[in-house]
């Protein structure tokens, strides 16, 4: 009797053996009664070719083992350039977009689901960033952060590690070009969770 295909992708050797045993014992009673045993081993993994394009330091086509992931590929390609997006890395398979990777999810939340396992002839495309927002002063990790259109000042504060212990928490100064003029306004704390930063904004936490 045909047991059909068994997907072992991403499993350890022990978990793969358990899954195969559970599948086989439905067909072969000897396995369930422990009169017959199942052994598995891993041979040399097959090679896959991955294309990496866009804002990486060493774009091109690379050979990997079949167990490699998107982040491994970016590392081998020399990492991303200064102008690269971290929020919109695209993975194409068979000429179709199958995943849009937001590295911030991994860096800030530990969400490893974005580290997709690669398959032969995949294309990784790293575009340029859309906009970056600066935040300086009394935050734990000041700097420039790439922001999505729907994100708020509260999101920016989270990316910057939050306010420092000695920060003035009631408001944050925003420097923005409005009607061709540079203006400074205060954003009060009750606005943090809905105020949306724009490209070129500079926030200062006192």
Feature-to-residue mapping (PLM):
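Ser/Thr/Pro/Gly-biased, low-complexity, turn-/loop-rich segments
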Residues: 1-206
């Amino acid at each position: 009797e045909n047991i059909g295909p068994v997907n072992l992708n991403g499993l350890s050797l022990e978990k793969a053996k358990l899954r195969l045993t559970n599948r086989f014992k439905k067909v072969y009673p000897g396995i369930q009664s422990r009169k017959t045993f199942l052994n598995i081993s891993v041979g040399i993994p097959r090679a896959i070719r991955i294309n990496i394009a866009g804002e990486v330091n060493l774009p091109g086509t690379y050979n990997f083992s079949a167990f490699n992931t998107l982040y491994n590929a970016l590392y081998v390609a020399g990492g991303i350039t200064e102008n690269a997006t971290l929020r919109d890395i695209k993975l194409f398979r068979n000429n179709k977009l199958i995943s849009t990777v937001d590295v911030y999810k991994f860096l800030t939340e530990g969400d490893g689901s974005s580290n997709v396992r690669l398959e032969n002839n995949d294309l990784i495309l790293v575009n340029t960033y859309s906009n970056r927002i600066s935040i300086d002063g009394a935050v734990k990790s000041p700097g420039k952060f790439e922001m999505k259109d729907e994100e708020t000042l509260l999101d920016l504060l989270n990316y910057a590690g939050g306010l420092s212990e000695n920060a003035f928490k009631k408001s944050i100064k925003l420097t923005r070009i409005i009607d061709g003029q540079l203006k400074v306004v205060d954003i009060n704390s009750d606005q943090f969770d809905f105020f949306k930063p724009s490209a070129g904004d500079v926030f200062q936490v006192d």
